Swiss-Prot record:
Keywords noted in UniProt: ATP-binding, Ligase, Magnesium, Metal-binding, Nucleotide-binding, Purine biosynthesis
GO process annotations (BP): 'de novo' IMP biosynthetic process
UniProt xrefs under InterPro entries: ATP-grasp, ATP-grasp_carboxylate-amine, ATP_grasp_subdomain_1, PreATP-grasp_dom_sf, PurT, PurT/PurK_preATP-grasp, PurT_C, Rudment_hybrid_motif
Protein name: Formate-dependent phosphoribosylglycinamide formyltransferase
Binding positions (Mg(2+)): E266, E278
Pathway named in the protein's UniProt entry: Purine metabolism; IMP biosynthesis via de novo pathway; N(2)-formyl-N(1)-(5-phospho-D-ribosyl)glycinamide from N(1)-(5-phospho-D-ribosyl)glycinamide (formate route): step 1/1
SUBUNIT field: Homodimer.
């Protein structure tokens, strides 16, 4: 393929929908290959906007606003980075001849827990948690009774653990309904109710669909707090048999979704069984660890796969990531990083978010070592040494 020059006739254009920390790294990798990048989000000065050639601030759930930018910019690739996007606009753009990554249909299916669960469990026959759906508090009570306690309640559409809760007693049901409604994205009150799986561990299996075929990164282990990523490490130690099971599930799901790019396939492991949880058709937050562990990060893999270029998923050494969270609410925060940078074998990535909020991810510490355990220690030490004021 021939790559033109950014901002000149013949350039290759990425229209990035969503401009958070993951999108920022995608833009940086695309820029390195001479791709013209346009970043879109609902607020000004979002992380990816700071490194893109051009940016727009719109509500991406607004069909007309989104279509207006697509028609104005005429991108070669529309690259969703978040889930709060009007998928009807993506489907129509695809019909008009635009390339949506990985596909418009894949974007629609994966942002809706009902659609992806029905695809995985009912169409593909994959092992998942038992589940029910509910549209009212009464239906939720019935679903909980069917599945038994404890169980997990999630909005059909939400992100980063928003709206999720565990129901451990009948007294929790009404509270879970309220939490789901408050955390939901989009219209309607529909929720998915899942059996609580007391898993041994959970992993993300980064799966790249490329012109050369499907490739897998080494499994990534992670810790979630309130459904949100807190730390991750690679490789996560698992048997060859379980890894093969995980890859088989990931390939079936990503083949069904189609298109090119990287997918973050989330899986539970319990005993000798791998259970499908969810999938994101884009780089995954737990995959930030690949910036220090692999020959190519998940972001470089994503960009190369989109463009049909060669991809490597080779692991260089064990490593870990640990999030840096704000402990204050402040606009235009400042960072003290001197002590963090004294920690050996580590790197920092500050996201550049204009607003610090208590509990918000503002950066990530990355570390490598001879073992995952040592890397986790170093990453945590580095992250906790950053002071935000």
């Amino acid at each position: 393929m021939a790559i033109g020059t950014p901002l000149l006739k013949g350039s290759i254009k990425f229209l990035l929908l969503g401009s958070g920390e993951l999108g920022k790294e995608v833009v940086i990798e695309a820029q390195r290959l001479g791709i013209e990048c346009i970043a879109v989000d609902r607020y000004q000065n979002a992380p990816a906007m700071q490194v893109a050639h051009k940016s727009y601030v719109i509500d991406m759930k607004d069909y007309d606003a989104l279509m207006a930018i697509i028609e104005r910019e005429e991108p070669d690739y529309i690259v969703p980075e978040i889930e709060a996007i009007n998928t009807d606009a993506l489907i129509d753009a695809e019909k008009m001849g635009y390339t949506v990554i990985p596909t418009a249909e894949a974007t629609k299916i994966t942002m809706n827990r009902e659609l992806i669960r029905r695809l995985a469990a009912e169409k593909l026959g994959l092992k998942t948690a038992k589940y029910e759906f509910a549209d009212s508090l009464e239906e939720l009570r019935d679903a909980v009774e069917k599945l038994g306690l404890p169980c997990v309640v999630k909005p059909i559409m939400s992100s980063s653990g928003k709206g999720q809760s565990v129901v451990r007693s009948e007294e929790d049901i009404e509270k879970a309904w309220k939490i789901a409604k408050e955390g939901a994205r989009g219209i309607g009150n529909r929720v998915i109710v899942e059996e609580f799986i007391n898993f041994d561990y959970e992993i993300t299996l980064l799966t790249a669909r490329t012109a050369e075929g499907t490739k897998f990164c080494e499994p990534i282990g992670h810790v979630q707090i309130d459904g949100d990523y807190h730390e991750s490490w690679q490789p996560h130690n698992m048997s060859a048999e379980l890894k093969e099971q995980a890859q088989d599930i990931a390939k079936k799901v990503t083949d069904a979704l189609g298109g090119y790019g990287i997918f973050g396939v989330e899986l539970f492991v319990k005993g000798d069984e791998v259970i499908f949880s969810e999938v994101s058709p884009r780089p995954h937050d737990t995959g930030m660890v690949t910036m220090i562990t692999q020959e190519m990060s998940e972001f470089e893999i994503h960009v190369r796969a989109i463009l049909g270029l060669p991809v490597s998923t080779k692991l260089i050494h064990p490593g870990a990531s640990h999030v840096i969270k704000a402990e204050i609410n402040k606009y235009a925060p400042k960072y003290h990083i001197e002590d963090a940078l004294k920690v050996p074998n580590t790197k920092l990535r500050l996201f550049g978010k204009p607003n610090a909020k208590v509990g918000r991810r503002m950066g990530v510490a990355l570390a490598y070592a001879d073992s995952v355990e040592k890397a986790r220690e170093l990453a945590e030490k580095c992250a906790h040494a950053v002071r935000i004021e």
